[in-house]
């Protein structure tokens, strides 16, 4: 076993989209940079989350949309070609190989060390390589932790022998389970229930709460619930799993015992019950932090409670907004900040400035790729009420918009806009309905830009598109 030492201006632990973007930004600022990655460069999003899940979902959602269009419905009524869908998923995931990502990192002059990186003290990182060697790294300016999150599993008796799916297995499975039980009611649960039901699985959802997508506007979860049930998904609310047992070895069925004493059999069970930070084994104790904790940061993504201002936490690991696009937004800011501080340049810390994150508080967009799609940004009505602001809620039936008619018959959808009546700006928007994912950026601009309603009236939507809902919401507000 060999040990080598190297010194860089910046060390990035974690080579997912967030870590890659931090590295690219600080390298563009002229700082020597290295990325340490223990799995695949490109991270969870590229190989086990965003890319493979959307590849599974797209044909399911497209078929559902097409089935409403007169003249198309008989042509799309049959089953999907599962083999081709899974092959496309594999291509979208680059067959779980990261050579292209490594080539890109090299093209921006960032070094890569494969292995498990751990902090060993201020500005110090030790990397255990797959070959058993140790590389000791020292940072002149900063270390950025971008290790993301992992699935959390509840303490259910029989969990070890049941070998449940997490989100990773759900997005990478090579065959359709005949019966799939999904525990959870959040985004992963509803998206994977949508995907695998559409591919031919009999899906049962076991939901602890009394609704789906409980963190969003209630009508969003209600519409998804209706559509899943119409597709044949068995959804059981207020249900707890008390024990699991997989019978007959690896390929045996899973016996699920429920809190009401009932039992359920499934070929696979997906536990979509939350995420935890990947910080258990990155050496936090060496700098006075608690292993396994989320890393608290300020608006420049410096970790609080660590002397010297050299440690940054970017992306899901700081628990501000657990989405890839927000993590990349954070990375652009953090990389710019690190570069500025290394050069002794002033930090512009006013709201919406180049060196602070403001959108993570005010304008976080999200799309849930179910049938129907759900798209949101900013506050929900419940959050707005809790904030103490004076808010007016404006609702509109999306089926009444001319653009919805182009999606065929029986369009079901809803739009909600939240107006801060003191400031005369939009602070939250939620859309539910086919095709609404493409509306979320216009909503994000309205919220992030704090566009006054008097000016928003002059943003004329094209006819006939779903975007015309903006005009209808404004008309409804004015009465």
Language-model regions, residue ranges each:
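Flexible, glycine-rich terminal cap/loop adjacent to redox cofactors
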Residues: 11-39, 51, 55, 59-62, ...
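FAD-site-proximal beta/loop scaffold in flavoenzymes
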Residues: 160-176, 263-345, 349-353
């Amino acid at each position: 076993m060999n040990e080598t030492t190297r010194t860089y201006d910046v060390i990035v632990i974690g080579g997912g989209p967030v870590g890659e973007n931090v590295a690219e930004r600080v390298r563009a600022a002229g700082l020597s940079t290295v990325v340490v990655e223990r799995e695949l460069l490109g991270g969870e999003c590229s190989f086990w989350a965003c890319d493979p899940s959307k590849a599974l979902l797209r044909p399911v959602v497209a078929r559902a949309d097409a089935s409403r269009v007169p003249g198309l419905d008989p042509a799309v009524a049959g089953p999907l070609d599962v083999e081709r869908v899974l092959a496309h998923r594999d291509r979208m995931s680059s067959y779980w190989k990261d050579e292209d990502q490594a080539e890109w990192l090299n093209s921006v002059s960032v070094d890569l060390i494969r292995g498990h990186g751990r902090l060993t003290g201020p500005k110090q990182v030790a990397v255990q390589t797959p070959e058993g060697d140790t590389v000791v790294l020292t940072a002149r300016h900063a270390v950025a932790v971008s290790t993301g999150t992992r699935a959390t599993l509840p303490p259910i008796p029989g969990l070890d022998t049941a070998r449940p799916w997490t989100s990773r297995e759900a997005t990478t499975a090579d065959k359709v389970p005949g019966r799939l039980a999904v525990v959870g009611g959040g985004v992963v649960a509803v998206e994977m229930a949508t995907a695998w039901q559409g591919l031919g699985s009999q899906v049962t959802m076991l939901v602890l709460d009394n609704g789906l997508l409980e963190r969003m506007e209630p009508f969003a979860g209600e519409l998804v619930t209706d559509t899943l049930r119409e597709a044949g998904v068995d959804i059981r609310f207020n249900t707890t799993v008390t024990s699991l047992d997989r019978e007959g070895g690896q390929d045996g069925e899973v016996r699920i015992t429920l809190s009401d004493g009932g039992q359920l059999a499934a070929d696979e069970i997906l536990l979509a019950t939350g995420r935890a930070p990947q910080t258990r084994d990155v050496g936090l104790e060496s700098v006075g932090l608690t292993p396994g904790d989320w890393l608290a940061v300020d608006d420049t993504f410096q970790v609080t409670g660590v002397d010297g201002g050299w440690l940054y936490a970017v992306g899901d690991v700081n628990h501000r907004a657990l989405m890839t696009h927000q993590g990349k937004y954070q990375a652009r800011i953090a990389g710019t900040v690190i570069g500025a501080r290394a050069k002794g340049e002033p930090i512009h810390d006013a709201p919406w400035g180049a060196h602070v994150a403001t959108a993570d508080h005010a304008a976080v967009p999200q799309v849930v790729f179910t049938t129907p799609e759900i798209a949101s940004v900013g506050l929900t009505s419940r959050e707005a009420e809790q904030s103490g602001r004076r808010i007016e809620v404006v609702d509109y039936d999306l089926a009444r918009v001319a653009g919805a008619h182009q999606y065929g018959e029986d369009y079901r959808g809803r739009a909600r806009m939240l107006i801060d009546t003191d400031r005369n700006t939009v602070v939250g928007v939620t859309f539910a309905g086919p095709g609404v994912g493409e509306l979320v950026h216009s909503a994000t601009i309205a919220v992030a830009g704090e566009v006054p309603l008097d000016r928003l009236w002059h943003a004329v939507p094209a006819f006939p598109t779903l975007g015309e809902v903006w005009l209808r919401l404004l008309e409804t507000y004015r009465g």
